Amino acid sequence: HQTLLKAQQYHELIGLDLKVIEDPQDAEFKEGRINIIDIPLENPDELKFGEVQAQCGNAAYQCIKKMVELSVEGKISSLATAPLNKEALHAAGHIYPGHTELLAELTNTEDYSMLLYSPNLKVIHVSTHISLRTFLDTLNKNRVERVINIANDFLRMAGYEKPNIAVAGVNPHAGENGLFGTEEIEILYPVIKKCQADGIKVDGPIAPDTVFLRAFNGEFDLVVAMYHDQ
């Protein structure tokens, strides 16, 4: 258990008991205990903490892959991941923009989006790990419609009988009728009208500087954001 031995060098500093298990059913849940399924490292002695390394990126990939396998097998019910260093991941040859795309490929999922969830605010993204310029160049009706439908399906699965969805605008003031950009007029309005005709309760596009507060205050169940840092 080379990976565990490396971790044990530090466990006394934080007062945790590390237990190696082969299967989730072998886990013992008690205070101070961390159950570990060991993922072997190729050269653990070469690890340099605080530095970006290819084998660290590969280790992260293998851990996520193992979690997905356990989830698909029904042995675990959810995943909790630490931040993924994209530079290390790419150095190991795993070319993914982030967790979202990696999880989609490992689960053979074609329609997907990143969703941020909290009791008071839920946000789903039309685009994720791409530049703002690329987002503007690739924004299209089909993608926006797919994300609205994903959002509606998710809320229904989460127990919302009549989901109420808001769509954020792309531009300041949601374009101000074309004064500050035409994406709202050319792309968002037509898609929203189509989704409404399909029976989805969706409103927008709404100015990005107010829509999140309105959702937080309970006016909407979820916001469809246009890009990663909106």
Residue positions per predicted region:
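Contiguous, glycine/small-aliphatic-enriched amphipathic segments in soluble metabolic enzymes
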Residues: 1-98, 144-166, 170-226, 230
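Conserved hydrophobic/aromatic beta-strand scaffold that supports enzyme active sites
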Residues: 3, 102, 114, 123-125
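Mobile beta-alpha loop/short-helix "lid" or hinge segments that flank ligand
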Residues: 32, 116-124, 165
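Active-site-proximal beta-strand elements of phosphoester/diester hydrolases
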Residues: 36-38, 123-129, 135
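Flexible glycine-/small-residue-enriched beta->alpha junction loops
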Residues: 39-44, 113, 117-119
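Short, acidic/small-residue loops that bind anionic groups at enzyme active sites
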Residues: 91-118, 196
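Active-site glycine-rich loop that binds ribose-phosphate moieties when present
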Residues: 101-110, 130-156
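Short, structured patches in soluble enzyme cores that scaffold and shape functional sites
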Residues: 119, 125-130, 169-171
